[in-house]
Amino acid sequence: MSRSKVFFDITIGGKASGRIVMELYDDVVPKTAGNFRALCTGENGIGKSGKPLHFKGSKFHRIIPNFMIQGGDFTRGNGTGGESIYGEKFPDENFKEKHTGPGVLSMANAGPNTNGSQFFLCTVKTEWLDGKHVVFGRVVEGLDVVKAVESNGSQSGKPVKDCMIADCGQLKA
């Protein structure tokens, strides 16, 4: 099975700041990767929340330097919302992949089996998250853009400037 590639075009403080390209582990966690891919394309239309199931126009609401950048709450924009293509939440698929370093793409959650649409991109190795968060992809291009977003974070997680996913989608194989 070939792995899907998806992208985010990022703006920081309203300025175009580059593209992040991610490879998804469709072969390891097909349900988790499939959810993220569909949220990048917006192909599933409107969700139960009444909002489009799409990352486009959403922001990185939690950015902690030397840790990670978190986004994917397209329903409320503050970390309390989000929705998967399967309905609200879905189970942890497996923990085969680990949080090995910068660029790891993983699901944010509120405890076991609470995956929705929120995700994070690691900016360092975060091994303490292994077995708690489902890793489902990695950055293959644009780690510098991830770092640019990270530089707009704070210890509280509140971003200094708005860091948005201005556009997103799937790249052809």
UniProtKB/Swiss-Prot annotation:
Keyword Transferase: no
Name of the protein in its database record: Peptidyl-prolyl cis-trans isomerase 3
UniProt keyword list: Isomerase, Rotamase
Similarity section: Belongs to the cyclophilin-type PPIase family.
InterPro entries in the cross-refs: Cyclophilin-like_dom_sf, Cyclophilin-type_PPIase, Cyclophilin-type_PPIase_CS, Cyclophilin-type_PPIase_dom
GO MF entries: cyclosporin A binding; peptidyl-prolyl cis-trans isomerase activity
Tissues in which the UniProt entry reports expression: Exclusively expressed in the single anterior excretory cell.
Ranges of residues in domain PPIase cyclophilin-type: 7-170
GO cellular component: cytoplasm
Reactions listed under catalytic activity: [protein]-peptidylproline (omega=180) = [protein]-peptidylproline (omega=0)
EC number: 5.2.1.8
PROSITE patterns according to UniProt: CSA_PPIASE_1 (PS00170), CSA_PPIASE_2 (PS50072)
CDD domains: cyclophilin_ABH_like
SUPFAM superfamilies per UniProt: Cyclophilin-like
Entry-linked Gene3D superfamilies: Cyclophilin-like
Function comment: Catalyzes the cis-trans isomerization of proline imidic peptide bonds in oligopeptides. Plays a role in protein folding, transport and assembly.
